[in-house]
Amino acid sequence: MKDIFIIGSRGLPAQYGGFETFVEKLISHKVSPAIRYHVACLSDESTGKHFDYKGADCFTVNPPKLGPARVIAYDMMAINYSLKLIKKEGIQAPIFYILGNTIGAFIVHFAKKIQSIGGILLVNPDGLEWKRAKWSKPVQSYLKYSEKEMTKYANLIISDNRGIETYIQNTYPWSRTTFIAYGTDLSKTTLTAEDTPVRDWYQKWE
């Protein structure tokens, strides 16, 4: 059995953006019975509550409310909880797949722990978050540094965009990278122009 711990999305079922939808589709299309997914889920209530979602072992994490820094605490707590679970259940050679660079400034500590138990650390860097104008200069500097640190300590950087992979390769030549595009649902929709979701969407954007 190969155990894969997914850290960094808000959890399941998907209710938000790209990472959450990616995780939902990933577990929904699992084929091999030899793979078991463990997914951290952000909670405002408790830490350590487990529930099954489409065969994935989901567990809640309730980080302290620290404003924008809450996501950093969330990822750190999720990794620590996963490490305890791995030890408790005797899981061998786990894979950690971290979505985003949020905890990059602290990743050396966690990378050493993961690799000391024979684990593998994979990272999806998302986009160029540090360039977004909504962040103050200190936050942009933190995110840029986090991005750099992730490339140093991850076993593999997985980009879902060719441009991001090229940027990582050119900026951090020591990094180990690969490109895996998101899949596309080619099945034809059964919705019509009269269905409520379609009408709501038109109304929202008219």
Annotated model-derived regions:
Residues 139-157:
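Membrane-proximal helix-turn-helix segments that form the acceptor-binding/catalytic region
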Residues 1-44, 89-91:
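N-terminal subdomain of nucleotide-sugar transferases
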Residues 41, 73, 98, 158-159:
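Short beta-strand scaffold positions
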Residues 72-83, 93-126:
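An aromatic- and histidine-rich active-site surface loop
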Residues 190-206:
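A short helix/loop element that forms part of the nucleotide-sugar donor recognition site in Leloir-type
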Residues 129-134, 188:
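A short acidic, helix-capping loop that chelates divalent metal ions and anchors anionic groups
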Residues 163, 183:
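Carbohydrate-associated surface elements
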Residues 55-80, 133-139:
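A short, charged, and often flexible helix/loop element on the N-terminal side
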